[in-house]
C-alpha cells in the first residue's frame, strides 16, 4: 500500500516529528512524507520517501504566509507547491492520503489542499482514502461556531477517517471542539504519538561528552528557534552567577530556524561550560 502523508509545520518542529513517527510506524507500506516547512536534518526509515515542498511559514501573529526563500514571492511558491502536489498524486496514485491537522487547522494552506481534495473526491487519482491526523488540543478560534461548522462540512465531504493523537482517558477532542458528537466519520484515538527514547543512550552520551557522574547536565532547547530568544539569553546571563558553576554543563540548542544575528549574540555569551548549537538529531539521547 502507498501512503502520502502531508505535514506543514509553520513555526516549530513538533508537527514534523509526530508525522515522522506516524510514517515510521507504517513500516509495511511505502510512505511519501511531504514536508512543507524549512528543511530539518532528520533520519528517515528505508520505507519513507521525503518530498520537501518549497518552504512557507507563518509570521509571529499567525496571520500572514511568508516564503522561506526571501527572493521568491509567496504567489510563486504557492504555484510551485500546487504543481508538485498534483504531479505527486498523478505519479503515485496512493491508497491513502493522510493530512496533518487540516481541516481543523492550516486553513491558510487551503490554496493547495482544497483543489487536491476536490480532485480526489472526483476520483481523478483513483480510489483514495483520506485521513485527518489531528493533535490532542485545538487552538480556540475567534468565530468558533463558524469554524466548527466548516470543519464538520469538510470532514463529511472529503474525509474517511479522523485519527486523534491523544489518550481518550486523559484528554478527549470534545474539550476543545464542541461538536464532536456531530462527526459522522469514524474517529480513532491513537494515544500520544512521540519518539521513543533509548533507555541506555543517555549514559552513553554522557561518556561521549566526558561528563562525570558528579557533574550535572542541563539541556536547554528553544525548539525550532523562531521564538525563545529571551529565555536562552537569560540562561546565558544567569550561568556565571550560579554557585558551583564548574560542576554544571549546559548543552543549549537554539533551534535550526534561529536567525543568524540572534545566534551570534547568544554565541558571544556562551562561556566555558556551555556549548551552543542550532540542533541535534540526538535530542532524546540528551534528555534520557
Place the predicted regions along the sequence by residue.
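Short loop/helix-cap segments at secondary-structure boundaries that form the rim of catalytic
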Residues: 39-47, 174-183, 260-270, 285-287
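A short helix->loop->beta-strand "cap" motif at the edges of active sites that frequently abuts
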Residues: 29, 124-129, 159, 185, ...
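Conserved nucleotide-sugar donor-interacting segment of glycosyltransferase catalytic cores
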Residues: 87-156, 170
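Donor-nucleotide binding loops and adjacent catalytic segments primarily
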Residues: 23, 195-288
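A nucleotide-sugar donor-handling region in carbohydrate enzymes
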Residues: 134-229, 255-260
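Active-site regions of enzymes building and remodeling cell-envelope glycoconjugates
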Residues: 45-56, 182-193, 270-277
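A short, glycine/small-residue-rich beta-strand->loop->alpha-helix junction that serves as a flexible
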Residues: 5-20, 228-230
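Conserved nucleotide-sugar phosphate-binding/catalytic loop shared by glycosyltransferases and other
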Residues: 7, 25-76, 80-87, 256
Amino acid at each position: 500500500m502507498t501512503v502520502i502523508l502531508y505535514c506543514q509545520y509553520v513555526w516549530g518542529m513538533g508537527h514534523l516529528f509526530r508525522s515522522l513517527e506516524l510514517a515510521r510506524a507504517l513500516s509495511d507500506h511505502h510512505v511519501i512524507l511531504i514536508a512543507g516547512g524549512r528543511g530539518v536534518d532528520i533520519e528517515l526509515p528505508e520505507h519513507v520517501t521525503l518530498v520537501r515542498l518549497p518552504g512557507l511559514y507563518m509570521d509571529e501573529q499567525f496571520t500572514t504566509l511568508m516564503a522561506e526563500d526571501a527572493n521568491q514571492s509567496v504567489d510563486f511558491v504557492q504555484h510551485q507547491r500546487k504543481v508538485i502536489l498534483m504531479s505527486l498524486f498523478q505519479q503515485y496514485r496512493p491508497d491513502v492520503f493522510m493530512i496533518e491537522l487540516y481541516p481543523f487547522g492550516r486553513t491558510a494552506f487551503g490554496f493547495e489542499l482544497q483543489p487536491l481534495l476536490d480532485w480526489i473526491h472526483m476520483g481523478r487519482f483513483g480510489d483514495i482514502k483520506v485521513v485527518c491526523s489531528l493533535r490532542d488540543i485545538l487552538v480556540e478560534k475567534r468565530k468558533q461556531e463558524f469554524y466548527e461548522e466548516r470543519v464538520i462540512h469538510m470532514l463529511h465531504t472529503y474525509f474517511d477517517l479522523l485519527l486523534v493523537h491523544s489518550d481518550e482517558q486523559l484528554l478527549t477532542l470534545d474539550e476543545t471542539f464542541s461538536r464532536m458528537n456531530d462527526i459522522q466519520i469514524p474517529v480513532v484515538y491513537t494515544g500520544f504519538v512521540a519518539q521513543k527514547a533509548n533507555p541506555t543512550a543517555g549514559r552513553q552520551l554522557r561518556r561521549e561528552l566526558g561528563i562525570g557522574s558528579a557533574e550535572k547536565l542541563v539541556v536547554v532547547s528553544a525548539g525550532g528557534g523562531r521564538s525563545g530568544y529571551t529565555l536562552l539569553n537569560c540562561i546565558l546571563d544567569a550561568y556565571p552567577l550560579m554557585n558551583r558553576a564548574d560542576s554544571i554543563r549546559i548543552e543549549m540548542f537554539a533551534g535550526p530556524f534561529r536567525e543568524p544575528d540572534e545566534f551570534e549574540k547568544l554565541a558571544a555569551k556562551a562561556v566555558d561550560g556551555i556549548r551552543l548549537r542550532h540542533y541535534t538529531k540526538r535530542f532524546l539521547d540528551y534528555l534520557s
